[in-house]
């Protein structure tokens, strides 16, 4: 008994000792893991850049569980969570994370991490959440991620990854969320995705994924969100998608999916969001979609859908947004489209082929806020009770065929913000009731036929930011109260019939950025209050009658980019328009501005068009304009500019139009002009340039028009002109060029106007000119020293309308081939030494076309004196035709007169015959009192009583109407 007790005590002691040892080992082991986690975390910290000091308390001197971003287990023995989202850290993700074997959640999202996702991440067997989205990670998604068998959430979106989605993803049997949007992924969706039976959300948006959507997707039976928009998926939507009955969101927008929309989508009765926009779906919209009773947002826009509108809000009772724009839908909106109590808020049917009148059914959609029926074929008038839609904020009906006036009731739609009615056939006035719309932000009525004054009440719409009435017939003045529109940024009134001055109050529209008043009948001067328009970027006042000098205060408008004051009567200096350094267009053409061109214009480095033509500007062209390297149009023509063309303009390499004509510029044409390789039009005419035309012009291969006429240029025409193969117009008239026309001109095959008149060119006319078959407007070689014969090749210029070879020393005959120029309207061969017969087709040209030659003859000149009888009788087609017509008319007239006489005499013979039957011998008395025996063969007067043919034609008439001859009583 004592021994038993003793033995029990020994066993108890052994058990306690063993338990103590085990506990000690466990505690030691757990402590070791805690120490191990801190070691690896400090290693990880050393590889990160921490500008915001988010890891500042990661230190051996503090307990690991107090470190920022860490979550420890309940017993604080190891780390189970690491959250450094948005901590501002950078660097790479270390492979050392693999040592945190108890880690369940790792969130490094929204940082600046780079490099690849380490394959060691696949060793974290306890990981349930991995969030690496919104970084700069690159490389492929490691296939080792498929080893994370407990993973439930994987989000890698918004990175710079590459490659395909690894098939090993299909091993994550517990995965609930997979997000890899915007990762540059390629390839197809691996069929292994169908193994993710628990998957709730699949986000593949904004990648370059391609191929078909796999049928295996049906294996994701719990899927609620499938978003794969903005990829390159093709083919049809698999019908198996209809088996995903838990699906609430289906977004396949902006792919290249095709075929018809499967009716099996109607089985997704829990669907609240369906977006198929931007694909290639065709056919009709399946009416089965009306069974989607939970749908709230439906977007089928930008496809090739056709047929009628089959979706009805009466069945889709939870529908809030319907977008069917940019298809080919036809027909009208169904009468049962909408019922009262509808939840529909947005209806977008733009850019289809819908027709009919404005759908009155929409008036039942009392909750509707936005209606876009633009770019269809709707017609008729707007309903007068449109104001039933009290929740309407945006009414977009532009580019249809609506007619009639704007109903006054529009002014009662108190929530209206946008009214887009442009591109219709609306007439009548703007109703004054429009002034009640205090929330109205934008009103665009352009391209209609509306008329009347702009109502003053419109300026009560103090929330207005945009007004566009372009292309109507509005008349009267601009409302004086326009300055009440403090938020106005766009005022476009171009192309109307507005009159009067610009109201000074417009200067109080201080947010105005675009002011377009062009093409009206406005007058007066620019009010000084314009200086308050500090945000203005564009002012177009062209084609009006504005006058006077510009207010100096306009120089305060520092943000101006586009100014067009052309075709007005402005005067004074243009300096007030140079306050902005942001000008891109300055057009002051056809005014009365004077003074010099301000060199300060060169501060606008982005200036592309500078047009100052038709003014009274003086002085020289500022050399500073050479700083305008973006300039493509420079027009300083029709001024009084003097001096040389500054060589600094050679820096304007983008210039396409250089127009300096009709000034008093002088000096030589500089070779640097040839460096302007974009030049399409060069006009230096009507100046005082001298010297040679530079051969370097041949480098301007894009030149279409070269006008150097009316200068003092001399020397030979450079042979390099043949390099200008795009040239249409070449005019050297009234200079002092000498020598030959270079044969290289035959290479300018697109010429339709060539004028070399009033020079000292000599030699023969090159036969190569006959190859310029596009010449149409003129070929003018007059007033030169050309000799030799007219080349017959000119007969190939079948399109030529004006040919002038006058005042030369040309000899020989006029080539018969010229007679084939059927388009010729003006011909001048005068003042040469031509002889011989003029082609008969030229007989219709005036004498002046052939005067002062040696021996030219034939119509319209005299007949050739030495001609044979046959030649004398040679007449033009027109003359022959005229003679034939005259003969035919004369013969016809004679025949008609004789026929008339015969008829009259035949009538008399009939009357005598009737009387004779009564037994009497009756004599018919003529108008001259003579008698003819009706029974005798002499029915005509004797020869001594016959008259001439002329007398017969004019006088032989038996006047039965004025002389009564009673033959039978």
Question: Language-model features: where?
Answer:
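Plant-biased, solvent-exposed loop and capping regions
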Residues: 1-969
